């Protein structure tokens, strides 16, 4: 029987915040494969450079992706903290572009890579990760993510 787990994550970027639900299975002994469903709330701001002024409105993005997580140095580290690396890929869409069953919105490709560490707090696995998130809507940002997993 596969080892199935669930989790929630809060991701903070320079231009907004995301809330995610993660479910997955243990793929190999030190690897996990997860499905990620979440929303990203983009902040409203004005960006002024020497060439242009850009106004951005608040947007809500729907994120559907898959994530592969590998635990590193499992045999070598003594202690509570375990380093991990993650690779994530999938699709993201602006919720305002979804108008019904005939028009499912403007979906764009996204990817993310990151590194962090895991530790247990009682029976809940906590994870702190720093990611580089690239998609056409947020234009590539660093993200800090706190996730909690349980069985």
Regions found by a protein language model. Give the residues of each.
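Short loop/turn motifs that connect adjacent beta-strands in outer-membrane beta-barrel proteins
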Residues: 1-5, 27-35, 71-83, 120-125
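Flexible, glycine-rich linker and terminal segments associated
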Residues: 77-86, 147-151
């Amino acid at each position: 029987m596969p080892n199935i787990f669930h989790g929630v994550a809060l991701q903070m970027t320079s231009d907004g915040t995301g809330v995610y639900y993660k479910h997955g299975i243990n793929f190999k002994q030190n690897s996990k494969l997860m499905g990620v469903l979440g929303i990203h709330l983009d902040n409203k701001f004005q960006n002024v450079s020497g060439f242009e002024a850009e106004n951005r409105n608040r947007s809500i993005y729907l994120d559907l992706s898959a994530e592969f997580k590998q635990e590193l140095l499992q045999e070598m580290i003594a202690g509570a903290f375990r380093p991990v690396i993650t690779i994530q890929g999938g699709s993201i869409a602006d919720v305002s572009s979804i108008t019904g069953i005939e028009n499912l919105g403007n979906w764009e490709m996204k990817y993310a890579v990151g590194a962090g560490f895991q530790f247990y707090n009682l029976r809940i696995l906590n994870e702190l990760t720093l990611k580089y998130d690239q998609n056409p809507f947020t234009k590539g940002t660093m993200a800090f993510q706190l996730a909690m997993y349980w069985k």
